[in-house]
Amino acid sequence: MTAANVPGSSIGVDALPIRENLRGKSAYGAPQLTVPVQLNTNENPHPPTKALVDDVAESVREAARELHRYPDRDAVALRTDLAAYLVRQTGVPVTVDNVWAANGSNEILQQLLQAFGGPGRSAMGFVPSYSMHPIIADGTETEWLPIFRRADFALDVDAATAAIAERRPDVVFVTSPNNPTGHSVGIAELRRVLDSAPGIVIVDEAYAEFSDAPSALTLIDEYPSKLVVSRTMSKAFAFAGGRLGYLAAAPAFIEALLLVRLPYHLSVVTQAAARAALRHANETLGSVHALAAERVRVSKALEDTGFHVIPSDANFILFGEFTDSARAWQAYLDRGVLIRDVGIPGYLRATVGLASENDAFIVASDEIAATELTSSGDRG
């Protein structure tokens, strides 16, 4: 069916009475292309084990017996399992009352801005960082206040605290490890941000399992009215298709989110599948060590080729410098390798994949390094 044959296709978004703050904005969209090597969305490349697949299938089969009923609207059993995982992973004695879950960490962040942002309120982030933060701010009519990082992409805590003191944001986002640069933020630095913030601080720990840095969860009891730590099962847990995000905070934050969450937002199927995935956490997270080793190997290969590699604590690598990032991205795609142009001039981001995928990426990088698309190639 052509566009001309689609009912209503004679108008575009601009013809709709859309909110003014959304006009001219672009939707989130990482390219989804079928190519031999896909290293653009920071997924765990290791597929689930047979034991996990079987457990998910059986759990969903059992849950299907109750599909005619609404699910547990508070997902108590799932939140209990998530709390137990966090205790094992971080050593912080959180309970079910400290944990909330939703359909991916983006829904968690959206609920937080619905409750603590909104018209007349502001959210601050340190860019470049996760591209969904400003999109969620726009969607909730929360003013977005971007503060630039240092030239090496690390968080400038002095500049951050000064900006917080000047702008007085209601919400502050700190991403650790930061996407797309890979830096982690230390506990001492987080304390400075928390001490300076007049409102809440959301520490986005989507990639925490890949980092050796202590989790911000250790600060929840110290900053109960300010700190929220968001996490996801999409990355290290290899559960991107399951769409499960969660947070840990003082119980009062969960009470606040109950005011804005949609009823029965987590399906019985999602809850059952996520609980099954958590039962296999040890096997799944075993791949984290393999990916960390591959991250070191790929980083060294890129550096040996002449690229500038930003140190990373996550499962991705930001590297450059390219004379034209968009053309360099296309050059990788032409070689069957899909990576990500994250909008940082001169740099691209590649997910750490399986060894064979990384080998293909390294070969493509060697070829591209010899062209006019890189600073070193241009000098040659």
UniProtKB/Swiss-Prot annotation:
A GO molecular-function annotation: histidinol-phosphate transaminase activity
N6-(pyridoxal phosphate)lysine PTM positions: K235
Keywords: Amino-acid biosynthesis, Aminotransferase, Histidine biosynthesis, Pyridoxal phosphate, Transferase
UniProt similarity note: Belongs to the class-II pyridoxal-phosphate-dependent aminotransferase family. Histidinol-phosphate aminotransferase subfamily.
InterPro entries linked: Aminotrans_II_pyridoxalP_BS, Aminotransferase_I/II_large, HisP_aminotrans, PyrdxlP-dep_Trfase, PyrdxlP-dep_Trfase_major, PyrdxlP-dep_Trfase_small
Top EC group: transferase
GO annotation terms (biological process): L-histidine biosynthetic process
EC number from the UniProt entry: 2.6.1.9
Domain of life: Bacteria
Known cofactor(s): pyridoxal 5'-phosphate
Pathway: Amino-acid biosynthesis; L-histidine biosynthesis; L-histidine from 5-phospho-alpha-D-ribose 1-diphosphate: step 7/9
Catalysis: reaction(s): L-histidinol phosphate + 2-oxoglutarate = 3-(imidazol-4-yl)-2-oxopropyl phosphate + L-glutamate
The protein, known as: Histidinol-phosphate aminotransferase
Transmembrane portions of the chain: none
Subunit structure: Homodimer.
NCBIfam families from the UniProt entry: hisC, PRK03317.1
